[in-house]
Each structure stands twice: as C-alpha cells, then as structure tokens.
C-alpha cells in the first residue's frame, strides 16, 4: 500500500526523524491558511499524488508570498499531473502539502528496501540526491553505497556512521545523520514497510539534516496488524478495478494490453501473460482468482475484466487442484450469461473434474472456444483479437 508524502512525514516525525514543518490542504483557502500558520518567508506548494517525478512535472512550486500560495494552489488543485510514474493518463491532484522552505546546502539519497538476493533489509545511500536513483544506479553504480542489515540485531550505529562518511555527510553533522537513519530503520521495521525512501535528504544552511521528500510503501499482507496505517489509504489514488477486486480477495493488477486474463495461481498467471506476449499479444491484466474461488468470485472476476474498455478478448487458464474445473466452468457460464459477453472467450481447463468442466461449457450453448493447452489457448486468443 502506498501513502502520500505528507502522511509519510507524519509517521517519520512521530519517530523523531527530522522533516520540515508542513500542513495538508484540500482547498485553495486551506492552502493560504496553512501558509499563514507556518509564517515562513518562503513556502513550498507540493501536489500530493501517489507518484514520483512531481517536481519535473510542475507539481512543486516555491511561493514567496501568500498571493503566490493562492495562485499556485489554484493551478495545482484539480490539475491532472503526468509524470514518468503515472503513465500518460496522469493523476488528478486533490490535496496539497504546504511546507516551510529550506535553505538547501546539499542533497543526498537515503533508502531502505528488502534485498531478495540476501533476504535482508539493505540501507542505501548516495550523494547524488534529488535525481532518479535508478538513473544513478544504471550510469554510476559506484556512487551508491549499501549496508546489509542483520535481522537478528537490526541496523547498527557503526553501519549508519560508515554510510554517512561514504556519502560525504559533513563531519560535524554525522551524528545527526546517524540518528536520522536509525529512526528511519525503526519506522521500516515497526510499520512493515516494503520501501522507505528519502530523496532528497538535505543538509540545510542552519546545520540540520532532514527529509525534504519522503516515500513509504507498506506490505499489504501485514496491514491487518497496522490499522493506523490502513487509515491513510486513499482510494482515489488506486485503480477502481483493483479496489473492487480486493473486496472479493481477487489479486488484480491492471495492465495496458487488450487480452483479459483469468487464472488461478500467481505463477500460472505470470506464465500466461508471458505466453500471450510470446505469441504477439498484450495482456490487459494480471488476475489470480486463488485456489478456493467460488462461482461468485469467478463472476465478479469477469465483471472486473470487462470493466476495462481496452479488453477485446478473454483467456481463462485454469489448472484445477484445490480449485475444481467444474466450479470454474459453472462460474464462467453464469458470468457470461449475466454480463451478456460478446467478446471472444478462450478457455483452457486442466486438472480436477476437468471432463465435467468441459461438459458444462459444451452444453452451455455459449460461444466459448476450448483450448487443449496453454500455448493453444494463447495462440487462439491472440488471433481472435487481431
């Protein structure tokens, strides 16, 4: 789960991690009032959307008066911001962060992620802050320093100190930087984060180390033990189809193609998308109905797939283990009748009760195209949507 920058900073502040003073605003008047409360000679008006690259897209403005705050807030609220992370459709700005301006002397990058190769959390740092860290990693990987954290003992002060020296934090501010990194790590562990990223971490003219921007993502599987974090969820920032799918415990991710996919099991779902690509098609989604799907779940899965106007055909690929093929077949027939499906539908069934499942499809009287294998099914649906 993702949250907004201002929400991430609220969490960091509660852990003693230094962030600029700021207020969230939902209207132009609230933005001006927030700037008045801050009383700073310079304020920054920042669009709040779940995407990076806001500055380059014109979503971050520096205001030197209340009039400028009003002007920038009017420009940004309701604007569709397009960044390299939003896709061409962009995201509408519905809230702003009004923040005190900082006298920035130097920008750095600090981040925490789970490294799957070592099964450890890794603390990363670079003095190339304020830029895309992926770009730095690709062009000048030697400028990124890493500290691998032993889960038994957590981040040690000597590791944070070593990283601070490696990225050339001024010596008189190293202790501040160490405290900052230790606090950030505590947030990462306590809140079950998947990413904690500060870009940029800045050194200010008055000798402070603080997070000018903050990104926290959370492991959705751990949210049951973090009701406080769940309250930060902003459904407006999520794909409506993905929100609807989550109500039925369906794992759905929207993609840019035109072939809808319904599969049981994440591995098979990824293989299905791969084979569609192999035969020249483009999957419109990842959709895993899980191992214990009912007819209702199958029906809702169909509705969600069809709510995407780009979908020109559907490929159902089921291997029945716990999931029985006859249940899937009944769900497919019911869903097809209920939604009045007119698009090409290719179904490949294999496993438990497969013959019964095929019989249900054959006797349904519907135009359902059977596939003998995954490759056969992929080829058929790709040809049908061309």
UniProtKB/Swiss-Prot annotation:
PROSITE patterns with a match to the protein in the record: ATP_GRASP, SUCCINYL_COA_LIG_3
Annotated GO biological processes are:
succinyl-CoA metabolic process; tricarboxylic acid cycle
Q: Gene3D superfamilies per the record?
A: ATP-grasp fold, A domain, ATP-grasp fold, B domain, Succinyl-CoA synthetase domains
CC annotations in GO: cytosol; succinate-CoA ligase complex
Q: What is its EC number?
A: 6.2.1.5
**Pathway of action:** Carbohydrate metabolism; tricarboxylic acid cycle; succinate from succinyl-CoA (ligase route): step 1/1
Q: Which keywords does the record carry?
A: ATP-binding, Ligase, Magnesium, Metal-binding, Nucleotide-binding, Tricarboxylic acid cycle
Required co-factor(s) are: Mg(2+)
What does the record's cofactor remark say about binding? Binds 1 Mg(2+) ion per subunit.
Tell me the residue numbers annotated for binding substrate.
264, 321-323
Residue positions binding Mg(2+): 199, 213
Where is ATP annotated to bind?
46, 53-55, 99, 102, 107
Record GO terms (molecular function): ATP binding; magnesium ion binding; succinate-CoA ligase (ADP-forming) activity; succinate-CoA ligase (GDP-forming) activity
Q: Which SUPFAM superfamilies does the record associate with it? A: Glutathione synthetase ATP-binding domain-like (SSF56059), Succinyl-CoA synthetase domains (SSF52210)
Protein family membership? Belongs to the succinate/malate CoA ligase beta subunit family.
Name by which UniProt lists this protein: Succinate--CoA ligase [ADP-forming] subunit beta
Task: Give the organism, scientific name.
Answer: Geobacillus kaustophilus (strain HTA426)
Q: What is the lineage of its organism?
A: Bacteria, Bacillati, Bacillota, Bacilli, Bacillales
């Amino acid at each position: 789960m993702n949250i907004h920058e201002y929400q991430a900073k609220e969490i960091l502040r509660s852990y003693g991690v230094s962030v600029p003073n700021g207020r969230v605003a939902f209207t132009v008047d609230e933005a001006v009032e927030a700037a008045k409360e801050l009383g700073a000679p310079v304020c920054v008006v920042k669009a709040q959307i779940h995407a990076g690259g806001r500055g380059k897209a014109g979503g971050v403005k520096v205001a030197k008066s209340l009039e400028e705050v009003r002007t920038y807030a009017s420009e940004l609220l309701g604007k569709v911001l397009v960044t390299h992370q939003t896709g061409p459709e962009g995201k509408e700005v519905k809230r702003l962060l009004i923040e005190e301006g900082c006298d920035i002397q130097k920008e750095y990058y600090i981040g925490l992620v789970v490294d799957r190769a070592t099964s450890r959390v890794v603390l990363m740092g670079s003095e190339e802050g304020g830029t895309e860290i992926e770009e730095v990693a690709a062009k000048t990987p030697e400028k990124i320093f890493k500290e691998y954290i032993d889960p038994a003992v957590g981040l040690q002060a000597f590791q944070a100190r070593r990283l601070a020296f490696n990225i050339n934090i001024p010596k008189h501010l190293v202790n501040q930087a160490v405290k900052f990194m230790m606090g950030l790590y505590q947030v990462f562990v306590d809140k079950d984060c998947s990413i904690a990223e500060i870009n940029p971490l800045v050194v200010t003219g008055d000798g402070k180390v603080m997070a000018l921007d903050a990104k926290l993502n959370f492991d959705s599987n751990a949210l049951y033990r973090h009701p406080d974090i769940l309250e930060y969820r902003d459904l407006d920032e999520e794909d409506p189809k993905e929100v609807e799918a989550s109500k039925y415990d369906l794992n759905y991710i929207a993609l840019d193609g035109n072939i809808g996919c319904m599969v049981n099991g994440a591995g098979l779902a990824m293989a299905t998308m791969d084979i569609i690509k192999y035969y020249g098609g483009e999957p419109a989604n990842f959709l895993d109905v899980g191992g214990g799907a009912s007819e209702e779940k199958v029906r809702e899965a169909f509705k969600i797939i069809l709510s995407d106007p780009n979908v020109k055909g559907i490929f159902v690929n089921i291997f029945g283990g716990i999931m029985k093929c006859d249940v899937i077949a009944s769900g497919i027939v019911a869903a097809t009748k209920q939604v009045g499906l007119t698009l090409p539908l290719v179904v490949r069934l294999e496993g438990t009760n497969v013959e019964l499942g095929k019989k249900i499809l054959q006797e349904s009287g519907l135009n359902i195209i059977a596939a003998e294998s995954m490759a056969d099914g992929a080829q058929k649906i790709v040809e049908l949507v061309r």
